[in-house]
C-alpha cells in the first residue's frame, strides 16, 4: 500500500502571489494546515470589526478642513448600528434634523452644484477612513480641470447608498457620487465603493446608478477610479442619464500593448509555443 505524506503543498502555490484569494492552502491529513485555519479566523474577525467600527466623521471633517474643504456632518434615519443593520430602509434616508439642516444650507447657498460629494460609513468605516482623502485628491484634480462645481463633502453617519439621492435632491445637484464602505470580504475589509447618479432624487433604484468597486491599494487605484468616474460624469452630462444605460467604456492605458499581451499567453499554461 502506497503511503502519502501527511503534509502536502498545493501545486498552485506559485499562483498565490497573483491574488489575495485563498488558493493553494495545502493540507494536513484531510484538513487545512493550522496556519491557514488561523489566518481564516483572523480575516473573519477583521471583517466583523470593520462592520462595527464607529465612523470617525469628526476626525475626517478636521482632515478635510486642513485641506481647505468644507464638510457637513449629517445622520441617516438609522439611530444606531443595530437599527442600521436590521433596517436597511432607514439608512437610505436622512434623519429629519439632518434633512432640515441640508435644506437650510441649500437656502443659504442657492444655485446648486454640478456634483454633490457624499461620504458614508456603509458596512466598513475602515474603508472610508483609509481611502476617502487620497481618492478625493485625485478626483478633485480632474473635476477642477472640467470646471465643475462641487458641494461641501457631506458626511453621513449610518448611511447607505441611496441616501446620496436625497442629499443631491436637497442640494439641487446635477449629479451625486457617494463614497461608501463596501461589505467586507475575507481578504478585503477596507474596500471602498463609488456610486454615481445623474439627476438624483428620492426613490431611485440601483438601475439608475453606476458603481465603481474595490477602490483600495490592493484593488482599483485612486487614479484609475477617478478616471472612470470622470468618464461616467462626462457621458452622463452628454447623454443625460446614468445607470444600466450608461456603460463604463473608459479607455485605460496599460503597461503592455495588445500585441505584447497576446504574446504572453495564458499565465496558467505558460508562454505560447512557437
UniProtKB/Swiss-Prot annotation:
EC category: lyase
Domain of life: Bacteria
Gene Ontology molecular function terms on file: cobalamin binding; ethanolamine ammonia-lyase activity
Cofactor: adenosylcob(III)alamin
EC number: 4.3.1.7
Tagged with keyword rRNA-binding: no
Gene Ontology terms: biological process: amino acid metabolic process; ethanolamine catabolic process
Binding site for adenosylcob(III)alamin: 161, 182, 211
Metal-binding found in the keyword field: no
Cofactor binding notes: Binds between the large and small subunits.
Catalytic activity as recorded in UniProt: ethanolamine = acetaldehyde + NH4(+)
Pathway assigned to this chain's UniProt record: Amine and polyamine degradation; ethanolamine degradation
Gene3D superfamilies: Ethanolamine ammonia-lyase light chain (EutC) (3.40.50.11240), Ethanolamine ammonia-lyase light chain (EutC), N-terminal domain (1.10.30.40)
Stated family: Belongs to the EutC family.
Function: Catalyzes the deamination of various vicinal amino-alcohols to oxo compounds. Allows this organism to utilize ethanolamine as the sole source of nitrogen and carbon in the presence of external vitamin B12.
Subunit structure: The basic unit is a heterodimer which dimerizes to form tetramers. The heterotetramers trimerize; 6 large subunits form a core ring with 6 small subunits projecting outwards.
Protein name: Ethanolamine ammonia-lyase small subunit
Organism name: Pseudomonas fluorescens (strain ATCC BAA-477 / NRRL B-23932 / Pf-5)
Taxonomic path: Bacteria, Pseudomonadati, Pseudomonadota, Gammaproteobacteria, Pseudomonadales
Gene: eutC
Amino acid at each position: 500500500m502506497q503511503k502519502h505524506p501527511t503534509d502536502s503543498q498545493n501545486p498552485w502555490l506559485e499562483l498565490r502571489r497573483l491574488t489575495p484569494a485563498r488558493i493553494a492552502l495545502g493540507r494536513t491529513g484531510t484538513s487545512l494546515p493550522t496556519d491557514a485555519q488561523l489566518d481564516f479566523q483572523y480575516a473573519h474577525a477583521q471583517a466583523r470589526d470593520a462592520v462595527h467600527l464607529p465612523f470617525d466623521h469628526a476626525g475626517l471633517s478636521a482632515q478635510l478642513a486642513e485641506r481647505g474643504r468644507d464638510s457637513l456632518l449629517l445622520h441617516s434615519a438609522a439611530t444606531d448600528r443595530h437599527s442600521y443593520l436590521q433596517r436597511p430602509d432607514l439608512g437610505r434616508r436622512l434623519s429629519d434634523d439632518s434633512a432640515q439642516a441640508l435644506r437650510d444650507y441649500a437656502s443659504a447657498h442657492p444655485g446648486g452644484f454640478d456634483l454633490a460629494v457624499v461620504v458614508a460609513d456603509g458596512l466598513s468605516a475602515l474603508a472610508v477612513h483609509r481611502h476617502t482623502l487620497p481618492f478625493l485628491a485625485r478626483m478633485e484634480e480632474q473635476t477642477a480641470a472640467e470646471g465643475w462645481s462641487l458641494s461641501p463633502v457631506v458626511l453621513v453617519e449610518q448611511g447607505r447608498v441611496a441616501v446620496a439621492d436625497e442629499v443631491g435632491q436637497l442640494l439641487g445637484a446635477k449629479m451625486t457620487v457617494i463614497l461608501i464602505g463596501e461589505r467586507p470580504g475575507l481578504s478585503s475589509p477596507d474596500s471602498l465603493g463609488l456610486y454615481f447618479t445623474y439627476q438624483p432624487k428620492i426613490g431611485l433604484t440601483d438601475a439608475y446608478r453606476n458603481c465603481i468597486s474595490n477602490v483600495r491599494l490592493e484593488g482599483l487605484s485612486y487614479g484609475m477610479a477617478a478616471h472612470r468616474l470622470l468618464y461616467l460624469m462626462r457621458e452622463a452630462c452628454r447623454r443625460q442619464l446614468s445607470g444600466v444605460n450608461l456603460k463604463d467604456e473608459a479607455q485605460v492605458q496599460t503597461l503592455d500593448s495588445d500585441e505584447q499581451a497576446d504574446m504572453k499567453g495564458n499565465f496558467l499554461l505558460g508562454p505560447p509555443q512557437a
